[in-house]
A protein has these predicted regions:
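Extracellular glycoprotein-like low-complexity segments
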Residues: 35-163
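N-terminal secretory signal peptides that target proteins for export/translocation
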Residues: 1-12
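Generic preference for hydrophobic/aromatic residues in regular secondary structure cores
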Residues: 1, 29, 50-52
Length: 163
């Protein structure tokens, strides 16, 4: 498993992570038992920003990514979306089941709901030529124990990235 942990800068009671990558060669899985999804096709590019508010149980992730050359594309009606954010002794992970995202008139896929007592709002929007934008915001997650450095894993179907 290759996963790169990046230091964070503490801003009040929030952690903030900004990552800009042009290429990623990663294969990851459930080595720690928290992350069950396994990406077989690494993202070709993965840019990421994360904010964590421990006291309010909020995790916000903004990412844009480009599918790798071997990808068969995204099929959200038939593929689940898994996200894991961990650091220190804290971890938050969620799997949004296949078919949960609904497509709107602009081509954006959105999900609003509650999973494991945590409120979630998520969206995936196609940009251009295999590039996508991903956003998620949680409310009410147990984020006790979070500390630097933080690692983020995102998997959509068999495509994914880790930082």
């Amino acid at each position: 498993m290759i996963a790169r942990s990046l230091p964070l800068q503490r801003l009040a009671r929030k952690f903030c992570l900004v990552v800009s990558l042009t290429s990623i060669l990663v294969h990851f899985g459930g080595a720690n038992g928290l992350y069950a999804a396994q990406a077989q096709q690494p993202f070709a590019a993965f840019n990421l920003k994360v904010e964590i508010d421990i006291e309010d149980g909020e995790v916000e992730v903004w990412a844009d990514f480009t599918l790798g050359a071997g990808s068969n594309g995204l099929d959200l009606p038939n593929e689940s979306v898994s996200l894991e954010v961990k650091g220190g002794t804290g971890a938050y992970s969620v799997a949004i089941p296949a078919g949960s995202f609904k497509k709107d008139g602009s081509g954006r896929f959105t999900f609003q709901g509650t999973i494991d007592r945590v409120k979630l709002e998520a969206s995936i929007r196609p940009l251009r030529d295999g590039a996508f934008e991903f956003e998620v915001e949680t409310e009410g997650a147990n984020l006790k124990g979070f500390a630097n450095p933080v690692t983020v894993n995102l998997t959509i179907g068999d495509d994914g990235g880790s930082r």
